[in-house]
Structure formats: C-alpha cells, structure tokens
Amino acid sequence: MAGNTIGQLFRVTTFGESHGIALGCIIDGCPPGLSLTEKDMQHDLDRRRPGTSKYTTQRREADEVKILSGVFEGQTTGTSIGLLIENTDQRSKDYSNIQDLFRPGHADYTYHQKYGVRDYRGGGRSSARETAMRVAAGAVAKKYLKQIHGIEVRAYLSQMGAVKIDKVDWEQIEQNAFFCPDADKVDAFDELIRKLKKEGDSIGAKLTVVASNVPVGLGEPVFDRLDADVAHSLMSINAVKGVEIGDGFEVIEQRGSQHRDEMTLDGFKTNHAGGILGGISSGQNIVAHIALKPTSSITVPGETITSKGESAEVITKGRHDPCVGIRAVPIAEAMLAITLMDHLLRHRGQNADVVTTTPKI
C-alpha cells in the first residue's frame, strides 16, 4: 500500500490499524533545536482521543504517545522523529458478525476489491483511528510554527446537521465538548446528538480551520499551490467529502467587484480568498472549511452484500461517533499545520535571500 506519506521537506508517514498492536509515525525534516516532549503532543491527542465525552465513541484509549527517536535531552536533533501509540481497548469481537459483510458507506468493499484481503476489525487501516498519529505529528508542526514564527492554527465546529453557529468566540471553543465557538448553540448540538443516539443514527458536520500570522509567500505554483496542498491534506481526513478555501462555493453568486480583496496601505479590506492568492499566501489569515459525511457505522438496519456474493442485512455494532465532526477538530488543525510547516521550509530553502522593496500590508 502506497500513499502513507505527506509532505516534501516536512514529511509525515503513518502506519498501523484500528485493532492492531499499535499506531506509529515517522516525521522527517523537523529542524533541530526545537524543544519537544511527549507532553507537547498529548494535549492535542487528548482533544482527539475517544471516550472523552458522552457525545463520542466510548472506546477508551489513553493515546499516550512515546517518542522513539529524533529527540535528545528534550530537543529535536534534526533526524527522523519516531512516534508510537499503543492500542489498548480493542474489542474485535464486536466486528465478528460483519467479517464477511461489506458495510455500506465504508471502505470494506473497495479495500477488498483492491487488495483481495482486508482487516475487518474496526475498518483496519481505513479507520479514523489512524488520525491519532496525524494529530501527534501536527502537534510538532504547530509548536514549531507558533514558537519560531508566531503562526497559530485553530479550528472549530461551525455546523452540525442543520444547526449553524452565529458567532465565533475563540475563548468558548475549549469550554464545551463540541469545540463550538458559539455558546448559544451548545444546547442545540447536545439535543441533536441525544436524538441521534436514541435513533441509532448519525449526522454530518462542517468544520472551519484558521491559520493566523502566516507570512506572505508560502506556496509553489503551479501544481503545488498552497490552496491545492491545503485541500489535499484536509481531503485526506476520513469522512471529508468537501473542502472550501475562503468563501468557497459562495463565489458562484458573487461578482468580481464583490469578491476581490481590495488593498490599502493599511492592509486588505476583505478576505474572500481565504488568505491565498495565485496559490501563494497573502499574509492574511488562511481560512478553510471542510464537510464531513455522517458515519455509516449505525444501528439502523441497511441492505448490503457479502464477500461471497449474497444479499444481507447489516447492523453495525461496536462503539462509534454519532458525529465524526466533533473529534475531527484537532485533526483538521494538524493537517493544516503539517502543510504550512512543509511549505514554510520549502519557501525558506528557495527564497530566504529574496529582497523586495514592495511594502508588506
């Protein structure tokens, strides 16, 4: 299986399955001298890990990360950073009834057709359990970006089902289990999740991820445009079915006179482009939105087929999220941070000596 690595200069490779012994990743390209301990990654891992609230899957994993290499006396050495998280709460028996079934909406059928064999326990490699290592690697990138360049990457839940937020208060995001920036919508989210759990169903969501204090110049035209790579990294997250940069699909109804981000000596007047122009960062906030589908791991009976070519009914047992968008918030942050880290190192390598007299706004 290829496709387990993302990035060019800051490269992240993950491995492991949902019910395997452990998950792991290798980070190549992290500059030396960055102070780093397991604690630096644990905060974001705790935000993502299962079993932390009544609104998410009750699989209980400590998700305690171990640094295997690349760090000496609390500092990165510039060599490969090896990270490992052990799986401790697998309940593979929950999946024994579906080992020959293809769950609709999941990767069971496509994995089986592509490889001729699949790990049916919790989805194996296709499970969102894999994203724990992305979050760990993303925490390294987030620390470097913030500590060395003052870049901050944050995300929040902006919509669940038909319930949309009306305002953004960054102080509220960590005050509730939904990563919701609008305190007035928390009860509505709570009511929706309770209803879904009672019905055995699930719902989709929309997340917004923002990077602030990003310098001008990140991005490599034409095929490695920053927005193209941001879309690629966010689209690689499990259950993501759509990505918007800036105003996204709203531009369809906008006019050029409305959409263009006019400039003054004091700065840009608007940010419809989401902080990226011509595939290169403009110095404004980078803003992206992702749409996540409702999980198909539900107890509502559904029609499917077996690997032996028989018709069957499927009811997914096990422990699952009624809305995968909740725990995807730190994952979205991680993927944007990894992409920005990679492009920052690439920009530094090629353009560190570029001098321009053009004022920065």
Swiss-Prot record:
Repeat in keyword set: no
Biased composition (Basic and acidic residues): 38-49
Source organism superkingdom: Bacteria
Main enzyme class: lyase
Protein name: Chorismate synthase
CDD domains hit by this protein: Chorismate_synthase
Reaction(s) catalysed by this chain's protein: 5-O-(1-carboxyvinyl)-3-phosphoshikimate = chorismate + phosphate
Organism: Photobacterium profundum (strain SS9)
Cofactor: FMNH2
